[in-house]
């Protein structure tokens, strides 16, 4: 069953988020005060509304309690983001996710009711930095502060060796959790022999993964 989303704010993040959610088969309503932005995205989402997100009656008319997730994507105007987040919770929104640019803003948003805060620019910068600073890195996902999963090509000297031979966990404090083959994630055990073109998924602290690949 498709999830329902309310996306408030049609900047770059809000627009791209709404479109990707639609691509994934969800139902998406968007709200912004800029008529041009709303008209541009309207053909591509379930519903598109023009209105002031800080107007309680406007938000009430959208029935925030009926959405599975409400995204507040207006971090450029922090006062507006705060008020909108607070109003959504007052109107019964079950899950409010707010965009923030600073840690202080995130703390305040959580304090007034946001269920989760995201930092899209910072997260993208971190992913990009990791991809280009780690040899062979293909993808990077931070699961929690200080813990990540990375997809990468195996280092050249791993070829023809097993996880057991290389003693990866003990030496680097990194776990090899799977391998990617023909687009699918497959299990891997300690006796698997790496080939030069093996793609693996590893989990651990980002600095440990970096040391393992670049120095190991």
Where are these regions (language model features)?
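Residues in the short beta-alpha loop(s) of Rossmann-like NAD(P)-binding domains
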Residues: 11, 34, 102, 206
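Cytosolic Rossmann-like ligand/nucleotide-binding regulatory domains
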Residues: 8, 31, 158-216
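Hydrophobic Val/Ile/Leu positions in short beta-strands of Rossmann-like dinucleotide-binding domains
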Residues: 6-7, 72
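N-terminal Rossmann-fold NAD(P) dinucleotide-binding loop
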Residues: 14-15
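Phosphate-bearing ligand-interacting subdomains
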Residues: 40-128, 153, 208
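Short beta-strand element of Class I
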Residues: 27-29, 96
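Aromatic pocket-lining residues of Rossmann-like dinucleotide-binding sites
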Residues: 21
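Anionic-ligand binding region
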Residues: 103-166, 191
């Amino acid at each position: 069953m498709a999830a329902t989303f309310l996306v408030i704010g049609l900047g770059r993040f809000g627009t791209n988020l709404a479109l990707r959610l639609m691509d994934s088969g969800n139902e998406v309503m968007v709200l912004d005060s800029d008529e041009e932005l709303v008209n541009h995205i309207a053909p591509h989402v379930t519903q598109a509304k023009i209105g002031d997100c800080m107007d309680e009656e406007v938000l009430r008319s959208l029935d925030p309690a009926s959405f599975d997730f409400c995204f507040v994507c207006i971090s450029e105007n922090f006062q507006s983001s705060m008020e909108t987040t607070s109003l959504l919770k007052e109107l019964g929104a079950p899950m409010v996710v707010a965009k923030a640019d600073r840690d202080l803003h995130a703390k305040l948003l959580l304090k007034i009711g946001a269920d989760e805060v995201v930092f899209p620019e910072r997260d993208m910068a971190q992913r990009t930095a990791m991809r280009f600073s780690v040899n062979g890195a293909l993808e990077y996902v931070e699961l929690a502060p200080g813990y990540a999963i990375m997809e990468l090509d195996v280092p050249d000297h791993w070829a023809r060796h097993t996880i057991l031979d290389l003693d990866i966990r003990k030496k680097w404090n990194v776990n090899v959790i799977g391998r990617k083959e023909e687009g699918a994630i497959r299990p891997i055990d300690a006796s698997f022999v790496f080939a030069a073109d093996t793609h693996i998924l590893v989990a651990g602290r980002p600095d440990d993964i970096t040391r393992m690949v670049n120095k190991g």
